[in-house]
Amino acid sequence: MQYGEIITAKITDENATHYFVQKNGQTFALAKDQTDGEHYQLEEEIEGLIYEDMDHRPVIQINLPDIRPGFFGWGTITQVRKDLGVFVDIGLYNKDIVVSLDDLPDDRSHWPQKADCLYLTIMVDQKNRFWGQIANYEEIAKLFKPAPQRLMNQDVEARIFQLKLAGAQLITKEGYRAFVHESEWILPPRLGQKVQARVTKVHPDGSLNLSLKPRAHEAIEDDATMLLRLLDKSPNHFLPLHDKSDPEVIKSYLGISKGQFKRAVGSLLKDKKIRQEKEKGLYLIDKDDLSETR
């Protein structure tokens, strides 16, 4: 018999924690805490999936996982081993399966991390070992459905299922196909990563373009808040930066571009939270307002 098969077997023995079933002279253990309170009698037949658990015991599981040979589903990463690959919880009792490093991106910064999810199935090799097999595009495309036009500029939750040179393919939690171009990432994407993203385009076929970058007003708010906090902590509540400052000086001082700096300053001037002395710098003029931004 091959592990991963669903068999019908007869109960031949039990102890305090397990039932034991036999099929063709081979014995499999069934954990009693996995039977949903069901009690079985000797000679009664049960049906379940057989495999070897992490303690190297042949076992049978009667609550079939969604992910099994020929069936795909979402599995959760439980451990990352750079010398082996990633371990995935697919719903088997006392067993995770491995997705080999050979099936993962060459760049380990793109590997899934703990709690990320992969859409996959099980492959059983000639030594009766389970391996996770990541779904190809054609398989995951069976989940797709067209997105409505009203999603334009809305936020969606999506998961990366494929990485490409130009960006990443994702599927939203509703089943919409999405793409994020490499220019729209803030950090390098990971296979299996869940992201919150903004819809920048809804195509006629119902697929989406997404961006992980903040909206312009959100970016301004973040940069403005940073400036206020720096001014609050600086001697005399002053920063020696202005619209004539060298872009590299601004970048090294604040970590943002000169364009971002000018937009943030403009926003704070409009709100009367700072004043600007020409070619000298910025002063905080209303510390009471600062508490509202924290």
How would you label these PLM feature ranges?
Residues 1-294:
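Single-stranded RNA-binding regions, centering on S1/OB-family and related RNA-binding modules
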